[in-house]
UniProtKB/Swiss-Prot annotation:
Domain of life where this protein originates: Eukaryota
Location in or out of the cell: Cytoplasm, Cytoskeleton; Cytoplasm, Cytoskeleton, Microtubule organizing center, Centrosome
General function of this protein: Positively regulates the activity of the minus-end directed microtubule motor protein dynein. May enhance dynein-mediated microtubule sliding by targeting dynein to the microtubule plus end. Required for several dynein- and microtubule-dependent processes.
GO biological process: border follicle cell migration; centrosome localization; centrosome separation; chorion-containing eggshell pattern formation; clathrin-dependent endocytosis involved in vitellogenesis; dendrite morphogenesis; establishment of mitotic spindle orientation; germarium-derived cystoblast division
SMART domains xrefs: LisH, WD40
Organism field: Drosophila grimshawi (Hawaiian fruit fly)
GO MF annotations, alphabetized: dynein complex binding
All residue ranges annotated as the LisH domain in the record: 9-41
The protein's name: Lissencephaly-1 homolog
Length: 411
């Protein structure tokens, strides 16, 4: 199809070509072109670099078109393959589907953690830019920034009511933030000798657990800010700490390739899980609803060899995800499919699925009962570092080294 330019567009294009020839030293070509196009020898400033600008704009537009075409192809594929619509699928079967609902920008460095508020329509992102940002996940609106840390914020967690937020940082501190009114830091705790990599509230909300590169886990009293216990046993950097919903046990994972399950009220390690072949980056406790799917996948008969749990998922730099029965210290399932480190895990509230985030830039949805990856979302332009699944609303959020936070609608 022949494109027709207006007289003014032709004149601007000719001037831009003349400027390009002149600035790049094509004197003979410039002279011939001016004569052919009937241009004056006086070059106007507004045409300086115009051809290059138009060229790069076209490339950017082409890239956007390709991205949109990929998303459209994905959507068409789902329709052709007869993927059930949101109306036909029960909430227990909803999974995140492309394209993302929102891609949120504002952080100036990698995102380290994303979490949902337990009650309000808010989510929180932590970043290597030393800030914590609050967003409305339903509208995609930015709310506010919490500042106080002086180095990368490594993890954030809410208490059960969402009244307090705890954060930890490479600046060696743990901070408590009022999330009801002031959004101010109300306490700062010090005690670790190295990067504090993870934090979690115990369910009652009166204590916080922290994990550090100094190889220890510490328990802090919220009311006083005092350290009341130190748990030792890991031989390397402790990457993550996550408390079981009942509160009597918690799990940690480490660069020493192990996961440890601890008794909260004592300093005793209940069990050590040792099948990973590299650093264990992340862990997640399975909800009770996942028990039947995990048991079926493990091939356990309901009468004989039934696994009671509790069950824990772990993701590693060995690119695998493992699911454990921590009551007996046994690995029940291994999920293979990621092409790089597994950095984040979250169970579907309905218990049928597990979602994972990886340095291969994807989010994967795993059908636990059938031990297979049922969907791959090409989620980010760089490593995916964190993921969370809302307990009540059909949303998943992810964070990345590409400095974006993405909101995915489940249907």
């Amino acid at each position: 199809m022949k494109m027709v330019l207006s007289q003014r567009q032709r004149e601007e294009l000719n001037q831009a070509i003349a400027d390009y020839l002149g600035t790049n030293g094509y004197a003979d070509s410039l002279e011939a072109f001016r004569k052919e196009a009937d241009l004056s020898t006086e070059a106007e400033k507004k045409f300086g670099g115009l051809l290059e600008k138009k060229w790069t704009s076209v490339i950017r537009l082409q890239k956007k078109v390709m991205e949109l075409e990929a998303k459209l192809t994905e959507a068409e594929k789902e329709v052709i393959e007869g993927a059930p619509t949101k109306n036909k699928r029960t909430p227990g079967e909803w999974i995140p589907r492309p394209p993302e609902k929102y891609s949120l920008t504002g952080h100036r460095a990698s995102i380290t953690r994303v979490i949902f508020h337990p009650i309000f329509g808010l989510m929180v992102s932590a970043s290597e830019d030393a800030t914590i940002k609050i967003w409305d996940f339903e509208t995609g609106e930015y709310e506010r920034t919490l500042k106080g840390h002086t180095d990368s914020v490594q993890d954030v967690a809410f208490d059960a009511q969402g009244k307090l937020l705890v954060s930890c940082s490479a600046d060696l501190s743990i901070k408590l933030w009022d999330f009801q009114q002031s959004y101010e830091c109300v306490k700062t705790m010090h005690g670790h000798d190295h990067n504090v990599s993870s934090v979690a509230f115990v369910p009652a909300g009166d204590y916080v657990l922290s994990a550090s590169r100094d190889r220890t886990i510490k328990m802090w009293e919220v009311a006083t800010g005092y350290c009341v216990k130190t748990y030792t046993g890991h031989r390397e950097w402790v990457r993550m700490v996550r408390v079981h919903i009942e509160g009597s046990i918690f799990a940690t994972c480490s660069n020493d390739h192990t996961i440890r399950v601890w008794l909260t009220n004592s300093k005793d390690c209940k069990v050590e899980l040792r099948d990973h072949e590299h650093t264990v980056e992340c862990i997640a406790w399975a909800p009770e609803a996942a028990a039947s799917a995990i048991n079926e996948a493990a091939g356990a008969d309901n009468k004989k060899g039934h696994h009671q749990g509790p069950f824990l998922a772990s993701g590693s730099r060995d690119k695998t995800i493992r699911i454990w029965d921590v009551s007996v210290g046994q690995c029940l399932l291994t999920l293979n499919g990621h092409d790089n480190w597994v950095r984040g895990l979250a169970f579907h509230p309905g218990g049928k699925y597990l979602v994972s985030a990886s340095d291969d830039k994807t989010i994967r949805v795993w059908d636990l009962r059938n031990k297979r990856c049922m969907k791959t979302l090409y989620a980010h332009q760089h490593f995916c570092t964190s993921i969370d699944f809302h307990k009540a609303h059909p949303y998943v959020i992810s964070g990345s080294v590409d400095q974006t936070v993405k909101v995915w609608e489940c249907r």
